[in-house]
């Protein structure tokens, strides 16, 4: 095999692994657009945009990855859906996960609403194999926000429900309004 063929085969192999590997994190300089996904390390869960049932609206959610029928376990913007496929998820300068419509990047549709001063490499969002979306400080590894503290309609192993007397946080499940409206 000559050098050119070896180079071509090696390049194709590298490209295959580069594009077939999924990412489970985003940082302050990255975005997730409608059509992009975060995939947990062991492929148990996916985070991305979806339209439930016959709805024309788009939601940011987490669902089981290894189940044939999409089974959503968490929804970020259930009260404020996005019209069309214009959703963008990012981390803002304050360390919040922020969901915008591409048509209006100034007004967030949904946010984690935490108050952490972020720097370029400080805050990371990661989708864990438990289905928990965690926002953490990359330096101290301390959790800033997690989806398990804000459940929607599904209880997953590791979640806690009820009142946390120390923090005052009350966690509870709320059913979907219909198959097309989470």
What are these model-derived regions, one by one?
Residues 2-182:
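Beta-rich ligand-binding surfaces for carbohydrates and other polyanions
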